[in-house]
Amino acid sequence: MNKHVKELLYISLLSLPVILIFLSSAVTEIDTEIPYEIFDRKIMLISNSLALVLLALPYRAIRKNTNYNMNFKKVSLSSIVFVFILTFLFVLVDSPIVIWNKSVVFPEFLSSFETWAKLKESQLEELTIYLVSFDNFNEYLIGIIAIAIIPGFFEEFLFRGIIQKNFYLISRNHHLAIWLSAFIFSAIHMQFYGFFPRLFMGVLFGYLFHWSGSITYAMVAHAFNNFFAVTMWYAAQQGYFGKEYELGVNDPPDLPVVVIILSLILFLITIYFVRQKLLNERADKMG
């Protein structure tokens, strides 16, 4: 058996605790009659984020393997700024996909799955609304750490730094590795009505890792994406956009078509520039 396939089996075994947590949350029926207000929001945020530390367990399978070097320190400040810009433009470009994915209607023979998917989406949305309905600025800061920084680090560490790299070592095809790991990244969240936006987001993070050779850029992009979503919700909650403005926790802002088209053009220009910049930086450091 190929040694990298053996690594994949070991990685999968060590990932079982995480997989079981995700699957149990998906199949367990949430009692919506119990108000979330009886639980302390800060404790829920911290406990949920600490559970993500389990995502580092598969590192034991490859910790002595130089093929999995993630090059945390090999980054430049200017590139990080451009990654911020690229991620922001992606959020705008991704908004029509979010709207389309939420409106998907299944054929009759999949009606049971559709009912289940909508129920889970509704339950998770209620939970998310409670978690991000911060009572004060301190809770908002805890939310940034629990929802943006910790998931950004540990999810990228596993899905891009370990799984994507392993798929590449097996297939020797970067594109296959990026798309397959992004598929797993999106599927394991067990939220169909956010599957495709999360898939494309994972693909973006995968290419950032591939071009740069450093997992830091993917982590920064992931954390910024979550930070932006939490901050927009908090700002709307505080009335910074006006009292009449309402923003759904999983709904993108209603953007005019011209804004989306302009954002797409800027996104394509920026991603080309970022790709060249990261590839050049990687070549300089290797040379």
Residue ranges and their predicted role:
Residues 14-25, 52-58, 86-90, 257-277:
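Hydrophobic core of alpha-helical transmembrane segments in multi-pass integral membrane proteins
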Residues 13-23, 81-105, 210-228:
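Hydrophobic alpha-helical membrane-insertion segments
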Residues 38, 71-150:
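Juxtamembrane helix-loop-helix connectors linking adjacent transmembrane helices
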Residues 51-64, 139-167, 266-279:
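Transmembrane alpha-helical segments in integral membrane proteins
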Residues 223-287:
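C-terminal membrane module of polytopic membrane proteins
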Residues 154-180, 207-214:
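Membrane-interface helix/loop boundary segments of multi-pass membrane proteins
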Residues 186-190, 194-249:
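Functionally important transmembrane alpha-helices
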Residues 22-63, 77-88, 109-119:
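Alpha-helical transmembrane segments in multi-pass membrane proteins
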